[in-house]
């Protein structure tokens, strides 16, 4: 099997908005592996579509591709449940009273009541109203993953070998601290170097 074929197999990761973060371990030892040109272990995953939802809220095409993602990014994602991840929880921002800020823009009048929610950007908001306010002020469309604080990713991305002049087309998305989705590690690390290290990992998967 060529290296290109391996990259294609590893790129069959489908994404959706994150959900919950507890799951069961997947037995990755049953999948064959090989070594790529950089001397790194990669898994040879089948193209079988049997989607699972990872504990990071990302939908993987099958168990093997979740394992491949863990190896590639040094993550420890487990399986939350079989099937695709659920969509973000809808929120009704119209129920909050509005006021006009200094810029003449209408923004919700939010209380200081602490009732944290986790946004689809991986950021914890003190309450649902403040998530709505963030969307209006920043022009974003962040949804609510679930009630409660976001469960943090402890994995990091090693960008010491970057930048690189050309990145592959493999799709293993990462969400940067700038709320931008990067197609793969190479795209993300090139951006990290360009930002002089100010860009960090928000979470694995699409923003």
Curated annotation (Swiss-Prot):
Glycans are attached at residues 33, 76, 98, 196. Residues 24-87, 88-152, 153-207 form the Kazal-like domain. InterPro entries: Kazal_dom, Kazal_dom_sf. Transmembrane segments: none annotated. It comes from the Eukaryota. The record marks 169-170 as: Reactive bond 3. GO terms for cellular component: extracellular region. It holds the Pfam family Kazal_1. GO terms for molecular function: serine-type endopeptidase inhibitor activity. Residues 1-23 form the signal peptide. It is found in: Secreted. The record marks 47-48 as: Reactive bond 1. The record marks 112-113 as: Reactive bond 2. Disulfide bonds join 28-67, 45-64, 53-85, 93-132, 110-129, 118-150, 159-189, 167-186, 175-207. Keywords: Disulfide bond, Glycoprotein, Protease inhibitor, Repeat, Secreted, Serine protease inhibitor, Signal. Avian ovomucoid consists of three homologous, tandem Kazal family inhibitory domains. This is Ovomucoid. It comes from Dromaius novaehollandiae (Emu).
């Amino acid at each position: 099997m060529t290296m290109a074929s391996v990259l294609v197999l590893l790129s069959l990761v489908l994404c959706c908005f994150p959900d919950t973060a507890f799951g069961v371990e997947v037995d990755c030892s049953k999948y064959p592996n090989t070594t790529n040109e950089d001397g790194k272990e990669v898994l040879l995953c089948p193209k079988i579509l049997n989607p699972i939802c990872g504990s990071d809220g990302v939908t993987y095409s099958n168990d093997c591709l979740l394992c491949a993602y863990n190896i590639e990014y040094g993550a420890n994602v487990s399986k939350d449940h079989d099937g695709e991840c659920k969509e973000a929880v809808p929120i009704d921002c119209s129920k909050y009273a509005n006021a006009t800020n200094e810029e003449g823009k209408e923004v919700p009048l939010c209380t200081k009541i602490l009732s944290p929610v986790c946004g689809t950007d991986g950021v914890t908001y003190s309450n649902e109203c403040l998530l709505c306010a963030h969307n209006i002020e920043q022009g974003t469309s962040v949804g609510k993953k679930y009630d409660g604080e976001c469960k943090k990713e402890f994995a990091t991305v090693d960008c010491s070998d970057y930048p690189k002049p050309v990145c592959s087309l493999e799709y293993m998305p990462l969400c940067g601290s700038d709320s931008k989705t990067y197609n793969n590690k190479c795209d993300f690390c090139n951006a990290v170097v360009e930002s002089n290290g100010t860009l960090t990992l928000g979470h694995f998967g699409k923003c």
